[in-house]
UniProtKB/Swiss-Prot annotation:
It catalyses: D-glycero-beta-D-manno-heptose 1,7-bisphosphate + H2O = D-glycero-beta-D-manno-heptose 1-phosphate + phosphate. The record marks 53, 111 as: Stabilizes the phosphoryl group. This is D-glycero-beta-D-manno-heptose-1,7-bisphosphate 7-phosphatase. One of its GO terms (biological process) is lipopolysaccharide core region biosynthetic process. Substrate binds at residues 11-13, 19-22, 53-56, 110-111, 137. Keywords: Carbohydrate metabolism, Cytoplasm, Hydrolase, Lipopolysaccharide biosynthesis, Magnesium, Metal-binding, Zinc. Also catalyzes the dephosphorylation of D-glycero-alpha-D-manno-heptose 1,7-bisphosphate and 2-deoxy-D-manno-2-octoulosonate-8-phosphate in vitro. Pfam families: Hydrolase_like (PF13242). The active site is at residues 11, 13. Its main location: cytoplasm. The keyword Repressor does not apply.
Length: 188
């Protein structure tokens, strides 16, 4: 049995990059200040980095799965060029009211459902209790709770934070950039 590892689960839009709405082109992808350094530091601290992102724009016909994959590959390489290696990238292309029939469905992977986190747990042998979920929406916190992630972290870099999302979170930080120091402070 492989040894389990702690992970940082990361929402993408509004957590890693500025959420301009249905971001699917390299020109529109803008890393949030400080997140690359934070991700590098989290890797040094021994955490696996796993992106878990709802991409309903695919189901809604805003962009294709191929366009999403091209952007994801670019993001992955951009991070690798800065010494940040992602351990996994999971995405949900579905939406119950999608205009693209192939992706119009109720699924287990779309947050707030925990499917992407459970898949990552099983494939990467993740210690969920020692892990963190970082996102900007209530659905991120709900998915983390359903997957038994130890610490739910809401960030203020995406959509306006709701009281409901704050109540569902264990921590509320201004940005992913603040997470390494927050974890170190907690571990003292």
């Amino acid at each position: 049995m492989a040894k389990s590892v702690p992970a940082i689960f990361l929402d993408r839009d509004g957590t890693i990059n500025v959420d301009h709405g249905y971001v699917h082109e390299i020109d529109a992808f803008e890393f949030i200040d400080g997140v690359i350094d934070a991700m590098r530091e989290l890797k040094k601290m021994g955490y696996a980095l796993v992106v878990v992102t709802n991409q309903s724009g695919i189901a809604r016909g805003k962009f294709t799965e191929a366009q999403f994959e091209t952007l994801t590959e670019w993001m992955d390489w951009s991070l690798a060029d800065r010494d940040v290696d992602l351990d996994g990238i999971y995405y949900c292309p579905h939406h119950p009211q999608g205009s693209i029939e192939e992706f119009r469905q109720v699924c287990d992977c779309r947050k707030p459902h925990p499917g992407m986190l459970i898949s990552a747990r099983d494939f990467l042998h993740i210690d969920m209790a020692a892990s963190y979920m970082v996102g900007d929406k209530l659905e991120d916190m709900q998915a983390a709770a359903a997957a038994n992630v130890g610490t739910k972290v809401l960030v203020r870099t995406g959509k306006p934070v709701t009281a409901e999302a704050e109540n569902a979170a264990d921590w509320v930080l201004n940005s992913l950039a603040d997470l390494p120091s927050a974890i170190k402070k907690q571990q003292k």
